[in-house]
């Protein structure tokens, strides 16, 4: 297997794994293959961010592939050890983990917390911060405990662990500021009318500096993002083709938050469980270099839909999908 040279990357030939990418864009490439093997081709300390959502450790085996919960942690750590070597010293590894229940009983699995502890104790990562993704549009689950027996509320929050290689990862929260509330906007416009400086019980001196316009408010580590893509290009073309969409897609706003906060333009972003390649699409929009890996050819072929123009013909969509599925390597820029 050949190893890439980051110093000689071009926009459409970013890697050389001894195999061609399924498709390329201006900033990135999507590969079909085992990400554990493909990861080894990166030079050590070359990646700025690995942003991914691995197959969840669900008790019912899904078509996108997952292991029994007791095997899951060891399996995931085999990837994490390689990621740790390939990250830059100021690099980050952000992982979205879905919740799970123990088999047959309404008691939660703690596999995601076992991953967290072992990532720190055994692999050497640091927990830069724990995030929680609240998806208000998530359907009630699991059905047995929520819908049928009605003894548990719906599971609508995923843990998102932000790991870093060192204690000081690259980060800039000014890139992800949230819009001010209406009340805060009024305070900024006329602080004397809406605010009286005082010292709070905590000892913080709340003065006029708190009315300064900093471009937005500091976001919390609870990210409220709906996962509803019903009108998106990807799902529309999957429906047009009569093929199944990837069953576990996170919304673009999730990787967007971390890509903006943890990287700069031209930094390299990698998704080791690419799926429908949401991470690659966001990295492309944000002018980051990107590489995504996915084992299933049908998911890779469909993921190309994310990069197509809205007015592209059905014939062209079908042609692109089938050519990727048949093993061709496509430059989407030249086709679009």
UniProtKB/Swiss-Prot annotation:
Top-level class of the enzyme under EC nomenclature: transferase
InterPro entries: DNA_methylase_N4/N6, MeTrfase_CN4_CS, RM_Methyltransferase, SAM-dependent_MTases_sf
GO molecular function annotations of the record: DNA binding; N-methyltransferase activity; site-specific DNA-methyltransferase (cytosine-N4-specific) activity
Ligase recorded as keyword: no
Region (Disordered): 196-215
Keyword Transferase found: yes
Sequence repeat coordinates: 11-113, 181-293
Biased composition (Basic and acidic residues): 202-211
Assembly and interaction partners: Monomer.
Name of this chain's protein: Type II methyltransferase M.PvuII
Organism per entry: Proteus hauseri
GN (gene name): pvuIIM
